Amino acid sequence: MGRRILNDALRTIVNAEKRGKASVELKPVSTVMSSFLKIMKEKGYIKNFQVHDPHRVGRITVDLQGRVNDCKALTYRQDVKANEIGQYTERTLPTRQWGYIVITTPDGILDHEEAIKRNVGGQVLGFFH
């Protein structure tokens, strides 16, 4: 049975936020995890992250900001069409004002707002709020 790298990393971030830590170290590294963290940084949920030695097992150091309440990766990839993204966000996120769903699309890994703008669907990786 393989490890769920993205799920483990996001759980580590949530646990560190709950304990009031300033930073957290994530191991091992994946490109999907880096893209997920990039979206979290763009939306202001984490301060910064640095990838150390990405060609080996590597690690990522994440500087936390204290804004993450919950962050989960879906262990099953759920397909979402471009016109169904709004319905999916209403079911998944607590309110419409905050929180983001991360979707892997043919245009790359995007948050749900950008996927709606580009009118592309894909598979849901996870969400954070």
Curated annotation (Swiss-Prot):
MF GO annotations: structural constituent of ribosome
Keywords (A to Z) from UniProt: Mitochondrion, Ribonucleoprotein, Ribosomal protein
Cystine pairings recorded for this chain: none
Any GO CC annotation of this UniProt entry: mitochondrion
Subcellular location: Mitochondrion
Gene Ontology terms describing biological process: translation
InterPro entries: Ribosomal_uS8, Ribosomal_uS8_CS, Ribosomal_uS8_sf
NCBIfam families: PRK04034.1
Assembly, per entry: Component of the mitochondrial ribosome small subunit.
Family (UniProt): Belongs to the universal ribosomal protein uS8 family.
Identification of the protein by name: Small ribosomal subunit protein uS8mz
